[in-house]
């Protein structure tokens, strides 16, 4: 059986013009990574410790409230890899701390694959808003990116229409709709750290309430984006990650806030699998309408400012997905 290292070497040989760090990142996302006891001890240091609060409301079986988790893993090319620490991976890499060398190593068994580090703890973590809300409960951090959750629930779960691969807001510890004053104060504090953040993303669970559907959700995003905007003059580097809205809602959001880009995540590229794996999105928008609205959004946000994302691996979902990588 081929090892992860052998697989990486084969890919690097096959694709010599492809960044070896991107290949490593893809491999780490595929296989996952586990913190050794030595690494977990080391990341309790305040420089690394992100704490135990999970702003997307997910309970990972391998985590404990008594032990803080680090942020994303940093590679030597300055890119970062987000890992769900505590997930039950079947064949993960190990991240180990070498006391003698004073560095973290990514390992497969005893073989050292790469020298790695972790994104440092943001300066605003550990602080509270004037309402007493922990600031780290309001945003997740990816190196220089802040990701805010405007609505820490997803209404697709109410009737079993949630996306099949999603675990967001399932821990029971989330706060529902966030407070706009909390958001303003958290952003105000976060941007005090020189050069730390370059972009703000706003996301959250889906709320189809309103007539037409998503009307109230759009109004919520407007309030949150306006609260963020109080910290800036004019538009600010940002992205709204939400359902595919009709043009009239998107136009309101764009005109009333400082948002600069839009990302309605289709999640699954295949139409039949989309219907099966994303029943809520199919019910309230539909696959083809999702694509049409995404394309239409370019008229509002401009070329190069509209995105989407897919969930890697969904195309292999049984029984309707591809049966092999070759297929």
Where are these regions (language model features)?
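Conserved strand-turn element in the central/C-terminal portion of the radical SAM core barrel
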Residues: 235-245, 279-283, 294-326
């Amino acid at each position: 059986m081929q090892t992860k290292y052998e697989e990486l070497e084969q890919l690097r040989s096959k694709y010599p013009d492809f960044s070896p760090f991107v290949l490593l990142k893809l491999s780490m996302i595929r296989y996952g990574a586990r913190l050794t006891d030595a690494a977990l001890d080391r990341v309790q240091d305040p420089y690394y410790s992100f704490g135990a609060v999970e702003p997307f409301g997910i309970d990972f079986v391998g985590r404990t409230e008594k032990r803080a988790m680090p942020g994303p893993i940093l590679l030597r090319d300055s890119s970062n890899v987000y890992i769900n620490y505590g997930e039950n991976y079947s064949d993960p890499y190990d991240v180990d701390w070498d006391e003698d060398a004073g560095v973290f190593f990514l390992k497969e068994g005893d073989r050292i694959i790469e020298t790695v580090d972790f994104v440092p703890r943001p300066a605003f973590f550990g602080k509270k808003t004037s309402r007493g809300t922990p600031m780290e409960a309001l945003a997740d951090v990816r190196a220089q990116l802040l990701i805010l959750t405007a609505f820490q629930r997803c209404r697709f779960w109410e009737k079993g229409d949630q996306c099949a691969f999603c675990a967001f807001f399932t821990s029971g510890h989330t706060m529902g709709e966030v407070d706009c004053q909390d958001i303003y104060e958290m952003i105000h504090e976060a941007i005090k750290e020189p050069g730390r953040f370059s972009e703000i993303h706003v996301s959250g669970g889906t709320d189809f309430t309103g007539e037409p559907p998503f009307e109230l959700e759009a109004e919520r995003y407007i309030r949150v984006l306006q609260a963020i905007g109080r910290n800036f003059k004019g538009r600010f580097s940002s992205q709204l990650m939400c359902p595919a809205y009709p043009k009239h809602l998107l136009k309101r959001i764009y005109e009333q806030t400082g948002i600069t880009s839009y990302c309605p995540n289709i999640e699954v590229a295949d139409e039949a699998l989309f219907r099966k794996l994303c029943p809520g999105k199919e019910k309230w928008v539909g696959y083809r309408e999702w694509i049409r609205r995404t394309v239409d959004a370019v008229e509002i946000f401009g070329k190069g400012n509209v995105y989407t994302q897919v969930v890697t691996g969904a195309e292999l979902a049984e029984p309707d997905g591809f049966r092999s990588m070759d297929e």
